[in-house]
């Protein structure tokens, strides 16, 4: 048996600053892991949920998927309609399930019946929906609001999904953060680390920057400044 001891003296409370980055990105912290590579943790996360049957299809959910994708021609149309249905209809509700909670996602039968759960239940429902629609989809772990360090430790606080596109690339999806929103991945999660639980294993990934054209709020200002220094005008927001 090996025993590791870490100690530090005279530690003062961390002084926060206005608009600073997340505390986990600035304050001292200790990370430990018995996993040598991210790929190993990715495979483990995949196997834990596949062995449990987290995404096993059920007839009533299959009928809903068929209804939703009817008439949808492209893969993005199908992915979008499934993501938004799950986001809008599986309510976020954090209820303790006792011991055994963690990296195993609850199965579709439970989630579709209860229509509520935490992020892993919402993501798990979407993964099952995508698979019933013919897509290859898997769970992924992320740390919402702060970075994930390079050491492959368990420093995640949020569960999302990835779907494989026809191009062969994986696209991250977050149904928890996009209810009644046009996005498929919240722009608040740009350049955020995530780890897909895929059978071939994956290194730590980084979400892309959301293009400006995805955020088309335009402000037109028509103002006049008179000789007395008074500014009058109007703003039009579209």
Regions found by a protein language model. Give the residues of each.
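Secretory-pathway-linked proteins and extracytosolic
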Residues: 1-100, 227, 231-238
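Hydrophobic/aromatic-rich core segments of domains that either
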Residues: 120-210
């Amino acid at each position: 048996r090996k025993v590791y001891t870490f100690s530090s003296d005279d530690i003062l409370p961390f002084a926060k600053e206005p608009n600073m980055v997340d505390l986990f990105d600035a304050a001292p912290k200790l990370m430990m892991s018995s996993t040598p590579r991210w790929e190993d943790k990715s495979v483990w996360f995949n196997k834990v949920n596949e062995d449990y049957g987290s995404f096993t299809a059920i007839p009533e959910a299959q009928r809903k998927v068929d209804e939703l994708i009817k008439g949808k021609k492209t893969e993005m149309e199908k992915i979008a309609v499934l993501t938004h249905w799950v986001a809008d209809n599986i309510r976020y509700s954090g209820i303790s399930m006792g011991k055994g909670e963690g990296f195993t996602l609850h199965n579709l039968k439970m989630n579709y019946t209860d229509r509520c759960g935490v992020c892993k239940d919402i993501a798990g429902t979407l993964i099952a929906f995508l698979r019933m629609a013919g897509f290859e989809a898997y769970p992924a772990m992320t740390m919402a609001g702060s970075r994930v360090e390079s050491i492959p430790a368990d420093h995640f606080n949020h569960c999302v999904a990835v779907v494989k596109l026809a191009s062969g690339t994986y696209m991250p999806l977050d149904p928890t953060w996009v209810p009644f929103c046009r996005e498929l991945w919240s722009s608040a999660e740009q350049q955020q680390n995530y780890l897909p639980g895929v059978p071939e294993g994956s290194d730590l990934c980084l979400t892309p920057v959301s293009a400006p054209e995805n955020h088309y709020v335009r402000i037109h200002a028509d103002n006049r400044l008179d000789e007395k220094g008074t500014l009058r005008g109007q703003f039009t927001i579209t």
